[in-house]
Amino acid sequence: MTHVFEVYPKVNIFLKILHKEGAYHKLISRMCLVKDKLKDIISVKSALSFSLKGDFDCPLEENSLFKALQILKNFLKSKNFSHSVIKSLDTLAIEVEKNIPTQAGLGGGSTDAGGLLYHLNQIFDWRLSLEELYSMGSLVGADTNFFISQYKSTNATSYGEVIENFEEEPLENRLEIYAPNHVFCSTKAVYQAYKPETCFSQAKEWLKKPSLECLKTYDRNGLNDLLKPALLTNQALKDIESELGKEWFFSGSGSAFFRLKPMQKGGE
């Protein structure tokens, strides 16, 4: 058995913080898939023993794919799946050609974890529902459910893990990403530096806005509440941002930016 699949990054068209609840911030966001040059390629094979290979920037125990597999095993046990089904996860050889950067606001590790959970469910024909997959995804990381969903455009609420399909003309082929080299944003540091300016009360209105309308109406500061704190915590990012034109927007807690692809000459 060999299965190979591609996973693509997401961008946040808008990200608005509602309030802090416990240790984390409640938010609303529009997440869109971007199918451009940037992608990871994941290969899953049956082998004699488990292996996970890739150019990862963290120890195995902290890897999103590894975490997803542990959570999946526990879930299958709780649903009384057979011992042989659960053991089959211990003989997977998983290899990732890693191109999507982490700490960039693109869903770096969540992309792979969400894609893996979705595809393993298909490969092994477990017939787990989307809700069951979401229950696992939210334990891996807040963005993971977007990648499990396979939707092209979604509204994300709660801490980012509650996903709802947003019907609109997909922008997946119309956006391009700029991920600065060697500039990484710590999500934790950016959220800690966030200071609410006013109480945000227009969540319902924002969740109805088409993505294209958002990009044509607001600037990057108006769309993403995390841009200011990200610039405060990262001088290298601030230097880059100051050179960018108004057509660039900020994704997640950074450090990546994105824009609508410039219209090609000759109406191509």
UniProtKB/Swiss-Prot annotation:
InterPro entries: GHMP_kinase_C_sf, GHMP_kinase_N_dom, IspE, Ribosomal_Su5_D2-typ_SF, Ribsml_uS5_D2-typ_fold_subgr
Annotated GO biological process: isopentenyl diphosphate biosynthetic process, methylerythritol 4-phosphate pathway; terpenoid biosynthetic process
Signal peptide per UniProt: none
Pfam families: GHMP_kinases_N
Pathway this chain belongs to: Isoprenoid biosynthesis; isopentenyl diphosphate biosynthesis via DXP pathway; isopentenyl diphosphate from 1-deoxy-D-xylulose 5-phosphate: step 3/6
Molecular functions per Gene Ontology: 4-(cytidine 5'-diphospho)-2-C-methyl-D-erythritol kinase activity; ATP binding
Swiss-Prot/TrEMBL catalytic activity: 4-CDP-2-C-methyl-D-erythritol + ATP = 4-CDP-2-C-methyl-D-erythritol 2-phosphate + ADP + H(+)
Active site: K10, D143
E.C. no: 2.7.1.148
Binding positions (ATP): P101, T102, Q103, A104, G105, L106, G107, G108, G109, S110, T111
Keywords carried by this UniProt record: ATP-binding, Isoprene biosynthesis, Kinase, Nucleotide-binding, Transferase
Organism superkingdom: Bacteria
Enzyme class, first EC level, given as a word: transferase
Gene3D superfamilies: 3.30.230.10, GHMP kinase, C-terminal domain
Record's function text: Catalyzes the phosphorylation of the position 2 hydroxy group of 4-diphosphocytidyl-2C-methyl-D-erythritol.
Membership in a protein family: Belongs to the GHMP kinase family. IspE subfamily.
Name used for this protein in its record: 4-diphosphocytidyl-2-C-methyl-D-erythritol kinase
Lineage, broadest ranks: Bacteria, Pseudomonadati, Campylobacterota, Epsilonproteobacteria, Campylobacterales
